[in-house]
């Protein structure tokens, strides 16, 4: 390692180099299926916009894929600032495309992923043909670099338009260079289901098979076929759709009262969100609100029984498709939606639609209510078997602890909240059934070098240990009182300091909690942005600028509010941004137990927190200080 840290040591990655050096940051490197999905998404976006009616996908024996659509065709004119053709910009520049405004696409799935430029970067060769303006154009790339200039190779009818993308992934970037045919077929069929009237043909030249999908009533037919053979409630799926100003949602739902293999698929702009997200949370909440209202209106609930989302969700099979502008995903591979507004939109639409359906189909509705109530009663019986620590069975619980009612470790959460004022807001914002609040007064003790027998000398840490029901440095979690421990501190530097000290406490003195995945850090927003009737929350300066950039084409002037601390938020804001499972952001505290990674983590923490290593910290700050992100 060099001791001189100068400009010569700084590496600047250009064009597609970041993708080729760190492919795992941009795509799934297990198999190249995600590359195919990116190309297919571009064609499907043309269908969503009303310009394409047919898509053909061919898997060749050499494990290359060819995707053809009859959309508008990629732009071939010269880009005004880049000085090269539009198709070349799209293939060679990260974050380039026609979907960053709503002029070309009302809804688009291709905007928020890695884009076709990453397909180019990770492929041995990419050949593009474009039919546009009555002419056929061709351009080719190898390993991300252009090898054939854009040229006209023929003519076609002026109304004949479209794009052909033929690419062969580079095997060195993937664990297996072979496409998963089953996943590819499932993806294509789902696209056809979700985009009524779109014909999709899949030609598998490896296995010599061919499929054609065209659905006019896609969601209902697809769900019925998926649960074929099982008893369903209702007999025909509960289906519906609704289109708002900037969002549209469609769904199909069935319940399997006698059990069976449940189907749960969600999509955003026809992109499969395998890990769900805020739109699925909204679906759960909408169903819960409607069934609760139905049961209360008809006096169906036994005394002491309160329904939760899991009670109505337990045997539900669903297909959910959301189309929205400015969708935000967690990660480049778009497997989880994180847009907060989608939860509110979907839950509101589903609550109204499901309430109407319940009251129009009373016989089926009462059977559903019976299933949900039975689930709730089973849950309550199971909870009674878990005995909470009482005053007579151990140390008295901290007086400032606002405990929750449930004993279900799958759902209970303890929030460690910075400051009494924020603790007061959190107590009002919480779900009393599942969420407990323990306010902390100021910065806790730095316990990194404190011995286990002395760590409980700190009142704050003693309260944390008693509230959790476990002793420091113990591997016995049998008396653990909460399934999640959530650190909730301000988004400023002081809050980050407190969160760091708490993370150090758990890593050093409660390592079993961390290893078993019980510790989380809440991510409260630093900014609130209001424009007309829309509200957005930004985690940091970069996210604020990204939101403002998206809003600059909308009418009105955004109002930006910076939260100085959690105490500034009213309970409803705190709940929406930080405590509501449907809309909050939580980051799980983990560290790799592997021999190298685990020791590296502990070494870094020791350097940052040990009092005797001030000189090491000074040297580290001198070397890394230019990377700091300061909010002044």
UniProtKB/Swiss-Prot annotation:
Names of the cofactor(s): Mg(2+); Mn(2+); Ca(2+)
SUPFAM superfamilies, per the entry: ATPase domain of HSP90 chaperone/DNA topoisomerase II/histidine kinase, Ribosomal protein S5 domain 2-like, Type II DNA topoisomerase
Positions annotated to bind ATP: 5, 42, 69, 110-116, 334
GO cellular component terms listed in the entry, alphabetical order: chromosome
Residue ranges of domain Toprim in the record: 412-525
Keywords of the record: ATP-binding, DNA-binding, Isomerase, Magnesium, Metal-binding, Nucleotide-binding, Topoisomerase
Enzymatic reactions: ATP-dependent breakage, passage and rejoining of double-stranded DNA
SMART domains, per database record: HATPase_c (SM00387), TOP2c (SM00433)
Species this protein is from: Haemophilus influenzae (strain ATCC 51907 / DSM 11121 / KW20 / Rd)
Stated family: Belongs to the type II topoisomerase family. ParE type 1 subfamily.
Database matches in CDD domains: HATPase_GyrB-like, TopoII_Trans_DNA_gyrase
Pfam families, A to Z: DNA_gyraseB (PF00204), DNA_gyraseB_C (PF00986), HATPase_c (PF02518), Toprim (PF01751)
Chain positions recorded as Mg(2+) 1 binding sites: 418, 490
KW Ribosomal protein (keyword) present: no
Single annotated GO MF: ATP binding
Enzyme class: isomerase
Protein's name according to its UniProt entry: DNA topoisomerase 4 subunit B
EC number: 5.6.2.2
Binding note for cofactor: Binds two Mg(2+) per subunit. The magnesium ions form salt bridges with both the protein and the DNA. Can also accept other divalent metal cations, such as Mn(2+) or Ca(2+).
Organism lineage string: Bacteria, Pseudomonadati, Pseudomonadota, Gammaproteobacteria, Pasteurellales
């Amino acid at each position: 390692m060099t001791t001189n840290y100068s400009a010569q040591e700084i590496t600047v990655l250009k064009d597609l180099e970041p993708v080729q050096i760190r492919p795992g940051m941009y795509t799934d490197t297990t198999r190249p299926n995600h590359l195919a999905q990116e190309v297919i998404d571009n064609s499907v976006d043309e269908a969503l916009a009303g310009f394409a009616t047919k898509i053909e996908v061919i898997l060749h024996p050499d494990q290359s894929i060819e995707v053809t659509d009859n959309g508008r065709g990629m732009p071939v004119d010269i880009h005004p600032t880049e000085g090269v053709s539009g198709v070349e910009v799209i293939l060679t520049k990260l974050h380039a495309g026609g979907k960053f405004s709503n002029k070309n696409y009302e809804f688009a799935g291709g905007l928020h992923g890695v884009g076709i430029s990453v397909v180019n970067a990770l492929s041995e060769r990419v050949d593009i043909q474009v039919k546009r303006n009555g002419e056929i154009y061709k351009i080719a790339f190898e390993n991300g670099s252009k090898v054939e200039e854009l040229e006209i190779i023929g003519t076609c009818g002026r109304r004949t338009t479209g794009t052909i993308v033929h690419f062969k992934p580079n095997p060195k970037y993937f664990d297996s260079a072979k496409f998963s045919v089953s996943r590819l077929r499932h993806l294509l069929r789902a696209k056809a289901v979700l985009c009524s009237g779109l014909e999709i043909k899949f030609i598998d030249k490896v296995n010599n098979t061919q499929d054609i999908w065209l659905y006019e009533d896609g969601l209902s037919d697809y769900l019925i076929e998926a649960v074929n053979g099982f008893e369903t409630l209702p007999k025909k799926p509960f289906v519906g759709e609704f289109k708002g100003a900037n969002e549209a949602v469609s769904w199909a739902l069935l319940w399997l009262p006698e059990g069976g293999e449940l189907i749960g698929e969600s999509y955003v702009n026809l992109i499969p969100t395998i890990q769900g997200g805020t739109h699925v949370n909204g679906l759960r909440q909408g169903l819960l609100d409607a069934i609760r209202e139905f049961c209360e209106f008809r006096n169906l609930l036994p005394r002491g029984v309160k329904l939760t989302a899991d009670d109505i969700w337990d045997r539900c099979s669903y297909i959910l498709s959301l189309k929205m502008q400015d969708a935000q995903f967690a990660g480049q591979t778009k497997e989880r939606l994180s847009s907060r507004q989608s939860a509110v939109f979907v839950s509101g639409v589903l609550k109204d639609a499901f309430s109407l359906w319940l009251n129009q189909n009373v016989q089926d509705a009462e059977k559903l209510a019976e299933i949900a109530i039975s689930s709730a009663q089973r849950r309550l019986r199971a909870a009674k078997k878990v005995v909470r620590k009482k005053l007579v069975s151990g140390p008295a619980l901290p007086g400032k602890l606002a405990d929750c009612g449930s004993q279900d470790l799958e759902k209970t959460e303890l929030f460690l909240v910075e400051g009494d004022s924020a603790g007061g807001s959190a107590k009002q914002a919480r779900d009393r059934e599942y969420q407990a609040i323990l306010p902390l007064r100021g910065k806790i003790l730095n316990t990194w070098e404190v011995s286990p027998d002395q760590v409980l000398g700190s009142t704050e840490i003693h309260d944390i240990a008693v509230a959790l029901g476990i002793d420091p440095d113990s591997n016995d979690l049998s008396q653990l009182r909460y399934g999640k421990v959530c650190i909730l501190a301000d988004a400023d530097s002081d809050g980050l300091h407190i969160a760091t000290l708490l993370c150090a406490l758990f890593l050093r003195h409660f390592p079993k909690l961390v290893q078993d995945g019980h510790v989380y850090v809440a991510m409260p927003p630093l900014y609130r942005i209001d424009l007309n009737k829309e509200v957005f929350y930004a985690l940091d300066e970069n996210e604020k600028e990204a939101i403002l950039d998206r809003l600059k084409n909308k009418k009105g002037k955004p109002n930006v509010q910076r939260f100085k601390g959690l105490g500034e938020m009213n309970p409803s804001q705190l709940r929406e941004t930080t405590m509501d499972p449907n809309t909050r952001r939580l980051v799980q505290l983990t560290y790799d137990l592997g021999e190298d990674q685990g020791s590296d983590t502990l070494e870094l923490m020791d350097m940052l927190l040990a009092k005797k290593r001030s000189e090491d910290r000074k040297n580290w700050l001198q070397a890394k200080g230019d990377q700091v992100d300061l909010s002044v």
